From Swiss-Prot:
Catalytic activity annotation: Endohydrolysis of (1->4)-beta-D-glucosidic linkages in cellulose, lichenin and cereal beta-D-glucans
Annotated keywords: Carbohydrate metabolism, Cellulose degradation, Glycosidase, Hydrolase, Polysaccharide degradation
Organism: Ruminiclostridium josui
Gene Ontology biological-process annotations: cellulose catabolic process
pH dependence: Optimum pH is 6.8 with carboxymethyl cellulose (CmC) as substrate.
Record's compositionally biased regions (Polar residues): 10-25
Protein name from the UniProt record: Endoglucanase 1
Main function: This enzyme hydrolyzes cellotetraose, cellopentaose, and cellohexaose to cellobiose and cellotriose but does not hydrolyze cellobiose or cellotriose.
Lineage: Bacteria, Bacillati, Bacillota, Clostridia, Eubacteriales
Length: 25
């Protein structure tokens, strides 16, 4: 998970490791 891809994402990547993969679509 690269936080730099979603700088506006407020959800902790620790809790949502797949969140970026879901939002990137």
């Amino acid at each position: 998970y690269d936080a730099s891809l979603k700088p506006n994402l407020q959800i902790p990547q620790k809790n949502i490791p797949n969140n970026d993969a879901v939002n990137i679509k």
